[in-house]
Amino acid sequence: MNTPEHSELGKSSAYVDQYDASLLFPIPRLAKRLEMGVGATPIFFGADLWTAFELSWLNLRGKPQVALAQFIVPCETPNIIESKSFKLYLNSFNNTRFPDAAEVQARLRADISEAAWRGAPQASTVGVKLLLPEMFDREDVAELDGLSLDRLDVECSRYTPAPDLLSAVFDEPPVSEVLTSNLLKSNCLVTGQPDWGSVRIAYSGPQINQEGLLQYIVSFRNHNEFHEQCVERIFMDLWTRCKPVKLTVYARYTRRGGLDINPFRTSHPQAIPPNIRMARQ
């Protein structure tokens, strides 16, 4: 079984510039989910939205082509794709000739689907969209909608996940709120390098104490875990301690190595949000 410690993270890597799908390094989701109390059958739906800003290949005449790529990896896939391996894989397209962008898109979809669904009794596909240069000026930048928790002047002293900071009012009528923060920070599980993010929490149920929620978000500051795992941990802690009827947690992390990762988890089926980057991304 692939583990984070066996990946290329934190190691010197040769940059291959000829197409090589074997560079992708899938890591099973299950071990971390069991640690969080998720179990083999998650109670949430969702996906991991990736954006690749550094994708290039050669056309049949050897002329470089560029594009942005967006990926939707369903959270029911048994594996996440380790991000450095994703970067190395994308770099392997750099000096490889393809007849057109459609062939590149098809190759990306086939390879990433195989890695993400590897080991599943029934495999499916991931979503892949290429944005060519003539579409670049249509790309929007927008902030997360909702009431900002960052307006609160709270004292923060805990920098590892502290779910006991979460509380809700159970003896008052339920509410529906959308709360956001730009103060999410965690660290790479293997290298300890900082990962900076913003988070949007939408819920219906007992009103969540906002000061405690902000302190809880800040408590991830020194925590080592992958983006997807942090969002699932936030979801499970809120679900367990605050007992909402509906809950959605969506985080957008700043890019590293030309990639950003934006995990989305929700308690009820709904449309995946459009992959619109924020100013910090």
Curated annotation (Swiss-Prot):
Alphabetical list of Gene3D superfamilies matching this protein: 3.30.1130.10
Pfam families, alphabetized: QueF (PF14489), QueF_N (PF14819)
Enzyme class (EC, first level): oxidoreductase
InterPro entries (alphabetical): GTP-CH-I_C/QueF (IPR043133), NADPH_dep_7-cyano-7-deazaG_red (IPR050084), QueF (IPR029500), QueF_N (IPR029139), QueF_type2 (IPR016428)
EC annotation from Swiss-Prot or TrEMBL: 1.7.1.13
Pathway the protein acts in: tRNA modification; tRNA-queuosine biosynthesis
Residues holding substrate: I81, E82, S83, H227, E228
Keywords carried by this UniProt record: Cytoplasm, NADP, Oxidoreductase, Queuosine biosynthesis
Annotated localization: Cytoplasm
Listed GO CC annotations: cytoplasm
Domain of life: Bacteria
Enzymatic reactions: 7-aminomethyl-7-carbaguanine + 2 NADP(+) = 7-cyano-7-deazaguanine + 2 NADPH + 3 H(+)
Any Gene Ontology biological process: tRNA modification
Primary localization class, coarse: cytoplasm
Residues reported to bind NADPH: S83, K84, R256, G257
Annotated active site: C188, D195
Gene Ontology MF terms: preQ1 synthase activity
Family the entry assigns: Belongs to the GTP cyclohydrolase I family. QueF type 2 subfamily.
Function per UniProt: Catalyzes the NADPH-dependent reduction of 7-cyano-7-deazaguanine (preQ0) to 7-aminomethyl-7-deazaguanine (preQ1).
PANTHER family: NADPH-DEPENDENT 7-CYANO-7-DEAZAGUANINE REDUCTASE
Subunit structure, as described in the record: Homodimer.
Name assigned to this protein: NADPH-dependent 7-cyano-7-deazaguanine reductase
Organism name: Polaromonas naphthalenivorans (strain CJ2)
Gene: queF
